[in-house]
Amino acid sequence: MIHLHSPPTAPAAFGGAGSADWRRRRRWSWSSSSRAPVAKGGHLRPCVWRRGGDDGGGEDHHADGGGGGGGGAAWRARATTAGVSSSSSTAKGLQANIIEHETPRITKWPNESRDLDDHQQNNEADEEADDELQPLVEQVRSMLSSMEDGAITASAYDTAWVALVPRLDGEGGTQFPAAVRWIVGSQLADGSWGDEALFSAYDRVINTLACVVALTRWSLHHDQCKQGLQFLNLNLWRLAEEEPDTMPIGFEIAFPSLVEAARGLGIDFPYDHPALKGIYANRELKLKRIPKDMMHIVPTSILHSLEGMPGLDWQRLLKLQCSDGSFLFSPSATAYALMQTGDKKCFAYIDRIIKKFDGGVPNVYPVDLFEHIWVVDRLERLGISRYFQREIEQNMDYVNRHWTEDGICWARNSNVKEVDDTAMAFRLLRLHGYNVSPSVFKNFEKDGEFFCFVGQSTQAVTGMYNLNRASQISFPGEDILQRARNFSYEFLREREAQGTLHDKWIISKDLPGEVQYTLDFPWYASLPRVEARTYIGQYGGNDDVWIGKTLYRMPIVNNATYLELAKQDFNRCQALHQHELQGLQKWFIENGLEAFGMTPEDVLRAYFLAAACIFEPNRASERLAWARVSVLANTISRHFYSDMSSMKRMERFMWSSLYEENGNVLGLEGYAKDGILARTLCQLIDLLSQETPPVREGQKCIHNLIRCAWIEWMMQQINMKDGRYDKGRVMHPGSCTVHNKETCLLIAQIVEICAGRIEEAASMINNTEGSWFIQLASSICDSLHAKMLLSQDTKKNETTINQIDKEIELGMQELAQYLLPRVDDRRINNKTKQTFLSIVKSCYYAANCSPHMLDQHISEVIFEQVI
């Protein structure tokens, strides 16, 4: 049974008055009749829907669609349906400024719209689409299930240091012959060792010299040593030409140590080569900066580069050994320590990884936290995380188990922390609902500046980049995150202006583009499909290379399989979106909505915002409901704004379109355009109710609930001051509509209904549960709407806009604080919260995005196929 409350005005939470009186009002029973009551005096009242008996209770019988949109596949591709006209359908950056880009992107239909396969127009569409992608999905799933301490490529440099370890029993030869065998089998055709696919002079030279030293030390494979020396003689000059940002970790100390080892072995090497002078000078400077006493007492990143360093007190250093026996997870540093001390824990660490990697050890190991964190980041940014929710949850549980209030580094149980992995983990843990404190970043702040490692010599771009991303996920009062955001923003913008967005830890396809997107479109304004489309173009897959002591690759973090799955998935979604948009445009034209000042471009923008947030094929009903409600609500508002309509006329329109059985358009004689809108609204309500997943109460229940949502919205329009519309509040034609709070709430209600979350939609209409959350989200939308209007004014009031920006920022922080933590809050479904978050973020995006950039994103997301 459905009940209606009859408040005298709109509830206070949504801008109306008399909330207490509203709660005291009696209820009417609404059974089979669809005619709503009229309160005493003939004034129209918004309807409020509730289940159960007169006490508002009753058992929950709704069918939760789980965000799936139910039976949308059966209808989403058709343009018309029987009886209905057509198919259903910051610190900086965006916080205060409209993003402007010089080159506009003209958005238009492609010459030949891609046709969907026939199977995409029937109920089996989603299942068959999944079947086509399933091999790639299974490949990725297999990778994720194989994760242990990190998949990582071998380092010839580190393997050479392991090969240099003499037998611990005093007999002649190497302790680890498997390392020698790996070196012998890994020389490249040009005589060098190193990354075969990417030539870096730093990488090739240090790897090659290390391998020549190791083979010479044991008087093995003279021909290979000769080839290696020939390569070094021909390419040593390149060291002076290399970018300093791509210099491997500790190169200034490690390479001169190898040169001295070569000299001691009598190797024919150009020791006086001009390219070596600068390296030796930097070595002396760096050694002078290293606090020798402190490095023996407090764990620092220096422990990672001990090999060849003079004047070490090993008895003191052994106290700083990691629990796995390594020195900060470095095989080369640990091998050097083993040579100097014969320590059993050092031996156990080296022996374990030699066996695991069949002789060729990596430059760092383990890298378990690094891999677990970065995998989740890549899957989410590529837009394919929905296929791997269980695996992602397992990854985040793993990271959370090893999280500490001091931070983390690339491996568990580290006694040295760094900001890059800490920031990435903080961001993902918070987004996934884990309770993490931002005070962790106090460990990386000194004198108003943030750093990655204690004692670092240069600042890493990616460290500050991930710190900025983490700082965007802030709650009210978290000043440390505000400071981190300001500092990282200024650092990154300065490097951007200088054209020096190169990093010392990664050689990626488009790091400058990644940084620019994050600064221009922070978390509040980053829409899922826009982010995915952008990152697909930035992700290098197999070609992304990391910089440690040598170049290395992380095959479960960077690989072609993720990229191929992301491309195919994006293109399949895009093809469906194009088909839906065609139906939506047809619906718009057939209903004559162009006569009200709306344009096909307005429809395109409305659909884009919906599809950019709700993009999954099996959520078509939610996506099209969002777009259609947005278009029609905006059309109705514009129509009555432009005519400066009276309250009586608005009431008459609402009565004819929403209260009369099947709509009484004849009641609007003399107002032809009003009749067109009334008819369109009635038909849309019918269509939405038909295409919503069935519930126990039946289709009539859904139909009435959708009408209640529209009545609530119409009442808000009628109850405006003096019953008149302010023509100045209408946004300029062609601009991206940023809805006010009433329209945002209407969209949220109907999206929830179309998703099958009937109880949640009813709660919103009743506004009796979770009202604070709904009011907050709606208030943010209203502020964004006001900002959009002010930004279009020729006489911009910057003071007012800045004040609104501050209110929006605080509101978004409060919204994030409510949305993100994992709490047992049964008042509002988590998926309903996500609906509100999507709507608010779409408004944030639209209020701050320039028309040029908006059109570019529309082109990329809706029209331009990923190649």
UniProtKB/Swiss-Prot annotation:
Residues of the transit peptide: 1-35
One term under GO cellular component: chloroplast
InterPro entries: Isoprenoid_synthase_dom_sf (IPR008949), Terpene_synth_N (IPR001906), Terpene_synth_N_sf (IPR036965), Terpene_synthase-like (IPR050148), Terpenoid_cyclase/PrenylTrfase (IPR008930)
Keyword Chaperone: no
Transmembrane domains' residue ranges: none
Highest taxon of the lineage: Eukaryota
Pathway involvement of the protein, from the record: Plant hormone biosynthesis; gibberellin biosynthesis
Biased composition (Low complexity): 74-89
Biased composition (Acidic residues): 124-133
GO MF annotations in UniProt: ent-copalyl diphosphate synthase activity; magnesium ion binding; terpene synthase activity
Compartment list: Plastid, Chloroplast
Keyword Chaperone attributed: no
Motif (DXDD motif): 418-421
Disordered as annotated region, ranges: 1-134
Catalysed reactions listed for this entry: (2E,6E,10E)-geranylgeranyl diphosphate = ent-copalyl diphosphate
Any single GO BP term: gibberellin metabolic process
Cofactor section: Mg(2+)
Basic and acidic residues composition bias: residue spans: 51-64, 99-121
Binding site for substrate: K286, K504
Miscellaneous comment text of the record: 2 different ent-CDP synthases exist in rice, one being involved in gibberellin biosynthesis and the other in phytoalexins biosynthesis.
Recorded family membership: Belongs to the terpene synthase family.
PANTHER family according to UniProt: ENT-COPALYL DIPHOSPHATE SYNTHASE 1, CHLOROPLASTIC (PTHR31739:SF31), ENT-COPALYL DIPHOSPHATE SYNTHASE, CHLOROPLASTIC (PTHR31739)
Entry comment, domain topic: The Asp-Xaa-Asp-Asp (DXDD) motif is important for the catalytic activity, presumably through binding to Mg(2+).
Name of protein: Ent-copalyl diphosphate synthase 1, chloroplastic
Highest classification ranks of the organism: Eukaryota, Viridiplantae, Streptophyta, Embryophyta, Tracheophyta
Gene: CPS1
